Amino acid sequence: MTFNLGRRAIVAGAVAVLSFGAPVLADGHKVLDSIHFLIPGGAGGGWDGTARGTGEALTNAGLVGSASFENMSGGGGGKAIGYLIENADSNHGTLMVNSTPIVIRSLTGVFPHNFRDLTLVSGTIGDYAAMVVGKDSPINSMADLISAYEADTSGTAIGGGSVPGGMDHLVAAMVMEAAGKDALGVKYIPYDAGGKAMAALLSGEIAALSTGFSEAVDLANAGEVKIIGVTSDDRVSAAP
């Protein structure tokens, strides 16, 4: 069975004010003395990893003197968005990492603020979504997951590191819809970022996990989980 779903969100940095108080230089010279990353989710998730990886890359390249990080969970990213907008004047050197749900949830009225109140600075990564199960799970394929869902819809819980209506939830629902099942019937369990969601999968709390491919591939290579589906048009060589 083939599932041809959309690609996972491209993660972008967002900043309320673009004045960093330092001149922009070129040719490998330092651009900023320091930069602060506001992360709208918990530790170990995709936003967290992207922010810390970006900060490390900027400092290692000598473009930024130092990078600091702050996790601010709540409201599916809404707490951090509201904080950055409402405190823009005191956050000139702050970047917030986010992804497609910032647009989706703004358009659906979930956030009291609008993504247009922020300035998108850059796209940093693109990632596929992946459906993942534990190494000892009897589920070995997407067909197995669909069969388990058919047999016990409420007992086949799918977790994710985003709130209901977020990207992980949407991907799980799209999988079931593509298989001709009721997308609204998915029992989705949200966790505060991908790290906690993965821990729930490893402990057997959920039957499957909807997450970013990059968040699962290392554990899959280590034999701790099985990637049973990826939202790419073609097979991914890292998870054939």
Placement of each model-derived feature along the sequence:
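Flexible hinge/capping segments at coil-to-helix
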Residues: 134-154
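Hydrophobic residues within well-ordered alpha-helices
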Residues: 84-85, 172, 201-202, 220-223
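A structural signal for short loop-to-beta-strand junctions that line the ligand-binding cleft
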Residues: 93-95, 112-130, 157-159, 227
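C-terminal lobe and pocket-closing loops
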Residues: 215-240
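N-terminal (or domain-start) structured segment
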Residues: 26-117, 181-208
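A bilobed periplasmic-binding-protein/Venus flytrap-type ligand-binding module shared by bacterial periplasmic
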Residues: 38-42, 128-138
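N-terminal signal peptide c-region/cleavage motif recognized by signal peptidases
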Residues: 19-23
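N-terminal export leaders
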Residues: 6-11
